[in-house]
Every structure is written in structure tokens, then in C-alpha cells.
Amino acid sequence: MTFGTAGRLPPAPNPGAPAAATWQRDDWLTLADRMLAAARPFASPGHALVTFPGPEGGYGRAVDGLEGFARTFLLAGFRIAGAQGMGVDELVDRYAAGIAAGTDPSSPDRWVRLGEHPQAKVEAASIALVLDLTRPWIWDRLPSAVRERVVDYLRPAVGDDTYPRINWVWFRLVVQTFLRSVGGPHSLDEMNEDLTTHDGFVRGDGWMSDGPDRAYDHYVGWALHLYPTLWARMAGAADLAEQRRERDLAGLDRFLSDAVALVGADGSPLIQGRSLTYRFAAAAPFWVGAIAGVPSVSLGRLRGAATRIVRHFVANGALDKRGLLTLGWHGPWPRLAQSYSGPGSPYWASKGLLGIALPADHPVWTIPEEPLPVEERDTLRAIPAPGWLVSGTRADGIVRVVNHGTDHAVEGATVSDSPLYARLGYSTATTPVLDDSGWASPLDQSVTLVDEAGRVTHRAGMRLLTVHVDTDGVGVAGSRALAHWVDPDPGQRDHGGGRAGRSRPAGHLTVYSLVRGPWELRLTRVDGLADGVEAAALRLRIGGWAVAGDATATAGGGVAVVAGADLTSRLESVHGGGTAGVTAVPHGGPLAGGLVVPWLDHPVRPGAWVATFTELSRTPVATAGRACQAVVDEDGRGLHLAVDWPDGISTSTRLDAEHARPTQVSW
């Protein structure tokens, strides 16, 4: 694999402030060297296993050690390749020794084999990728007996049809591509099958879903766009890659136009989706764009996005005093882990340092960094594939996503809501509630029905109705859900999605969002209730943004406000009525401190629209009585909404009858 050319850590920014300082290549190398040096004491005597401290992962210590080796090998490989093998002898020797020991079945350091545990298939792909990337300095210098053992270790990937049909198809493909390049066993039929499966993930505008579910998350960037670009440069991929290079480049280019608008001015990625403990792996797609040479996003902006993301985590304590990554977001927060996570899992973050594989004279290092879109102006865009409205505000640097199409499920599913996917809103400044209550009883950024026993409905399986930006500069999105109660089956493994179980319908809910800047006007209607479900026994609950840290809260008169040190969440009934409240969740998410969530309860009146105003801002504009004024008229053509926003701007929005009409309730 080759990429052609075309010390110190700078001061960190204040939280929420635009990250104006830049990093030079030496700063990136200093960080990489620091991380690699910190990992070294946790290597086994033969260097084949890197077992970081902490509780044993969900798959056992042997897998933990392999994962620690493979994921730090990614970082070491980028470092070696970028240095062209010069001045990195210790890294070359350390990881070459680990490969020799790990592939030796008689070694106490031996790796878990691909047939012994599925996780070995994931880590084998990283090993194969880096062996290709560093071929002149590691592979070509390995003794022939060790090379034969490597081939033997990777061989089980050929003919194995148990790889899940998600991003894992790239693990089989990368391994077989490397084997092909060294004269090892491989199957062109299987390689083409994996490429075809990947193409089936494509949903439009450069977006892909990680499998058949509506699983839109950071894997789009750090896996589904990263692997095609790196794979195409592997020695064994040339003929297969050539026929798809232009198409893959176009998809990456289009995706990155959206991706740069999803990063907050402080460098925080969106706190949404599974595997968040991989942290600054979210920077990887921007380096991929630089490697591929995308035409629409400049190298300066790509590098600037990557810098802001990685620096955000460095500045906020992602590396502990030993220089190690732990399970968490900023600092440690073990509950962020999925069932597949172990102490070495966070080192998938190594992908965020992919740029150091590019040589010092690559243009990405020689031109100035450029600001993010949200640092230059307010932004508003609709992304149809995930059903997202994206609103970034320059005044406070926050990027918000209003979500009507992503749930890690399929339309019509009746699983529970995953708080990582199915909430109505995510942002770069907030976390969803992720404790047990967040999985069992959706509250933050949710619209639910609550029965007399306090049981809360879920909306997963909803139908996306529309997502667009209209001519008034208002983002419009809507969805319709069969609200349902779920009793989850016991013993399920956490892979980030909702829980399966016995479900019972409550009724159909339609929700529309009108979005401008930090504000959302949320329209909600109960279209009808299921047989045996009585309106009098229910409450319609509307939840707002959760605020982390020391927060003060007020609730009353149809208004709930939560104010933290530098963030305010406001929820207000537009037409009056409703009971306002707040709920504190002491250990609800990975940001510092507990969470406080504002909410409004309304009586259930099927067929009637309920209008709610929400605001999330570091510089709040709305005040009591001046939050938002809206007139909602319904006629045979649909809904017409005349809205006076807190900044004095008036807009007019129409929702057509096909979107706005009540559902025909059937169960």
C-alpha cells in the first residue's frame, strides 16, 4: 500500500469555543509516539499481546490482548509508513517480534485463532492492512517461517461465510486481499461477493447504512468509507479496485460535504451511535478524503476537521495520566461500552491518526488548516438517508441533529428504542441518557405515551415522512410511529441497537420538526389509539435536550428550563397547557456530572396537534413569553404554519396532506 505526495501539543481551546490554533505534523507525531510508548509496558514478553489494565472485556483476556496488539499496530503502522521506515526501528522490531510470537501456536503469546473467536476476524484485518502498508519494513524482513505462519493464521478467512453482513465484510475482504498479494489462498468469488454486499449498504448522497437496519452512525466514516479507500491501495486489490475507484471517490466526496458540517466548533463529534468509546476515530474519514483526493472539500478543511476532533479529546482528558485510552468519552465512563468492548477496544481511535501515514511533503501538511463550516456561519442542511436535519450555529459552535429516520431497526420493527439511535435529537454538546432508564423509558428528545403505571412507549420502526429545507430557510422533517410498549427478552447482548421482546401497541404518533438555528418547533399528534387503550389513562410526554454538569432547573406554567454552566435547554408549550417538569439522572451519560432533562406532559386528545418549542444554546435568545409564536391551520391540503421565531424572523411552512393526514390505524 502506498500513498503518494501531491514534540509538543498546542494549547487546548476553552470548551465550546472555536478551536483556532492549528497542529503541525510534528504535533501529530508527538501524540502518536506518546500513545505507543504508553502501550509498551502492557505488552507480553513476546510483544504479541497488549493487555491494557481494567476489567476483563466481554470476550475474555485472550481477545483483549489480541485487540490491544492489533489496534496499536494500526497506529504503529501509520507511524512507520509516514516515516518511510526511518527512525522507527524500535516500533518495527517490537511489532515484528509480536507477529512472530502471535502466529506461533506453541508460544505462550499466541493469538486467538480466527476459528476460535469471531473477534479475531476483526483484529486480523487490522494486522493484514498494516502488513500491506508497511510491507518494505516489516513483511519483507520477516523470516520465511514467520511469513508462512502469518498466511496460516489468516487462511481461515477463506471459505468462511459466517462474517456478519455489516462492515465486517471488509474484514474478510482485506485479509483475502493481503493473502492474494503474497501468493496465499484467496477466493475471487468471495472477494467480489463482499464488494457486492458493501454496495448494498449504499443509500444515497454518499451515505451508507451499516447493514440492512437504519444504522447510520460513525461507522459510515471510520469503516464504510475508510476501508474502500485503503483497500484500493493494497497490493492485491489493483484490478478489482480500478473498476470502482471513480464511484467510491464520488460517494466519499459527497459524504464528506455533510461530515464536515457534523463537527462542533470545539471539535466534538456527534454523540450518537454505537462504539463511541472509539472517540477520535471520528477524524478518520477526513484523512481518507485527503488520501483519496476528494475534489469538493479542501485539504485545509479536511485537516482542520481532523485536528479539531483529536485535540478535543486530548484536551478533555481522553488520555489518562499514564497516556492510556480508557472505556469512555472524555474521561472513563465504562457504561459507554457495548458487550464486545474490552480494555483495548478504545484503540480503534488510532484510525483518527491515519494522516501521519502521509509523508511530510504531502500537500495536506503544507497548506494551512481551514475552519469548519460552523465556525464560519450558521448552517442548515437536510440529509435524506438518515432522515436528519443538521443545524449548526456559529454563535455557540453547536451542531444539532434532528432525527426522523434513524433507529438501528427497520421500518415496522417493534423493538425498544436505542438511546444511541432513536432519539429525536443529538448534538455535539449533549449526550442522550444512557443509563438503564434511558434504554427502558425514553425521555430526553422523545415523544412518548405514558400509562398509569409509568410505562413509556418506544418509537423504533417509525416511517420517515419528509426531510428537507424549504424556501424560507426552515428545516422540515417528520415521522410517524406505532408507539409501543416493550418487555425486553432477558440475556440480550448489547450491540448498540434496541432490545427485542414482547411488544404491545399503544397508538400511532406523528411528529414534525421545524428547525431554525438553535430552535425546533415540534408538532405532535396522537393519530389514534390501539384497541383497549384509553386516552384518559395516558399522558403525552415531550422531552427536551439533556444538560450535563451542575445545572439549575425551573419548571412551571408550561415551561421547563435547564441551565448548566455554559448550556441552556428550554422546552415550552406554544399554545399553553401541559405540565412542566424536570428529571435528574445522576449518572446518565459520559459527560461530566449528571444529567437534567426538561419535559412537558399533556392530556391525550387523539387528532389534536400539540406544539412545543425547544431550544439548545450556549447563548439563549428565548425568554418567557417570547419563545415562539405559531399559528397552525389545517385544511384539505394539509397544514399551514405561520411561525414568529425568537429572533424576530417570521416564516411560513406548508405540510402537504399526504404527510399530515392521520394514519389509518390498524394492528
What feature does the model see in each segment?
Residues 2-67, 93-98:
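Low-complexity, Ser/Thr/Pro/Gly-enriched N-terminal "stalk/linker" regions
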Residues 43, 76, 103, 135, ...:
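Structural signal for hydrophobic packing residues in well-ordered secondary-structure cores
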Residues 62-66, 70-80, 88, 92-287:
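Aromatic-lined, polymer-binding surfaces characteristic
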Residues 81-85, 139-140, 361-362, 532-535:
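Short, solvent-exposed secondary-structure capping/transition elements
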Residues 106-111, 264-271, 276-411:
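Carbohydrate-active enzyme catalytic cores, enriched for enzymes
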Residues 243, 274, 298-305, 362-369, ...:
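Composition- and surface-driven signal marking solvent-exposed, interaction-prone regions
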Residues 373-374, 378-468, 482:
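Low-complexity, glycine/alanine/valine/leucine- and proline-rich hydrophobic stretches
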Residues 433, 438-667:
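Extended repeat-based interaction scaffolds and adjacent low-complexity, acidic/S/T/P-biased segments
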